[in-house]
Amino acid sequence: MPDTRDLYDDAVNLVRNRTHLRVVEYIRGHPGAYVSDILEGSDTPRGSLGRVLRALLELDVLTIDVPPEKRGTGRNFRYTVNEVRVRQLLTALHTELLGE
């Protein structure tokens, strides 16, 4: 289990970027979304979306339906929000800011 400070840092990285939040919000409402869906539905510029998705995957906020050993095979990924992780990050942010 990561320590609370790491969780807080990850939470700040999630919420400091409105584009990250917009993408998470879209995918949460459309689980299993493809990149083309996310581009259209979140109004995220094509040039930014790959970077945003990688950042959210690194934070473990998103999951994809392709196991690591199958990635790079040309298959389109379907993205889903890891709601447990989002709650964990928001709880860490709440605890750090409000001490509760």
Question: Which residues does each PLM region occupy?
Answer:
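Amphipathic alpha-helical dimerization/coiled-coil segments
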Residues: M1-Y8, G29, R78-E100
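Short, cationic-aromatic polyanion-contact patches
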Residues: A11-T19, Y34, P67-T91
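A short acidic, leucine-rich amphipathic alpha-helix
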Residues: D37-E40
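Short amphipathic alpha-helical interaction segments
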Residues: T44-E58
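Pre-recognition alpha-helix immediately N-terminal to the DNA-recognition helix
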Residues: L21-E25
